[in-house]
């Protein structure tokens, strides 16, 4: 009889350990799926109102590209060297020219310009045309840049104010 109670006790302990994990997975899965709906994955392609929809797979690849090429200075969409200029959609839309679209961001990554668009910052900001600053950027091709732009433009939709929101969210 004692061994029966010991066996039941071990089974109950195992169930109490596994059950919260199962419940947690069943609760979090729909939320994870919801963040990748078509609306979230659709962003402005250019300044003319055209739209482009990325796939979940493209954004996951883009996330890796961003983390390995951009996150050193732009972790969570904050600009380490100038926290007044983040990668949130509002800041991108107020840049000149606007960078709140794929074409605008790709052009910036190829030829970095000041926030007001007045002069090149290729000497201080990594980009395809940068000379000695973070030369790893020069290995990125147009498709890589397109994916990184898509990631930046979808990140705020997924992460909310934590993307580009500054250190109050960390």
From Swiss-Prot:
Example of a GO MF term: iron ion binding
Keyword annotations: Electron transport, Heme, Iron, Membrane, Metal-binding, Photosynthesis, Photosystem II, Signal, Thylakoid, Transport
Protein name (Swiss-Prot/TrEMBL): Photosystem II extrinsic protein V
Gene Ontology biological-process annotations: photosynthesis, light reaction; respiratory electron transport chain
Annotated signal peptide: 1-33
Similarity field: Belongs to the cytochrome c family. PsbV subfamily.
Quaternary structure and interacting proteins, as annotated: PSII is composed of 1 copy each of membrane proteins PsbA, PsbB, PsbC, PsbD, PsbE, PsbF, PsbH, PsbI, PsbJ, PsbK, PsbL, PsbM, PsbT, PsbX, PsbY, Psb30/Ycf12, peripheral proteins PsbO, CyanoQ (PsbQ), PsbU, PsbV and a large number of cofactors. It forms dimeric complexes.
Cell compartments where the protein resides: Cellular thylakoid membrane
Cofactor(s), by name: heme c
Superkingdom in the source lineage: Bacteria
Spans through the membrane: none
Pfam families: Cytochrom_C550
Cofactor binding note of this UniProt entry: Binds 1 heme c group covalently per subunit.
Listed NCBIfam families: PS_II_C550
One Gene Ontology cellular component annotation held by this UniProt entry: photosystem II
Coiled coil: none
Mode of membrane association: Peripheral membrane protein
Gene: psbV
Tagged with keyword Transcription: no
Presence of the UniProt keyword Iron-sulfur in the record: no
Biological function: One of the extrinsic, lumenal subunits of photosystem II (PSII). PSII is a light-driven water plastoquinone oxidoreductase, using light energy to abstract electrons from H(2)O, generating a proton gradient subsequently used for ATP formation. The extrinsic proteins stabilize the structure of photosystem II oxygen-evolving complex (OEC), the ion environment of oxygen evolution and protect the OEC against heat-induced inactivation. Low-potential cytochrome c that plays a role in the OEC of PSII.
UniProt binding sites for heme c: 70, 73-74, 125
Predominant localisation class: membrane
Alphabetized HAMAP family for the sequence: PSII_Cyt550
UniProt xrefs under Gene3D superfamilies: Cytochrome c-like domain
InterPro entries hit by this protein: Cyt_c-like_dom, Cyt_c-like_dom_sf, Cytochrom_C550, PsbV_cyt_c550, PsbV_cyt_c550-like
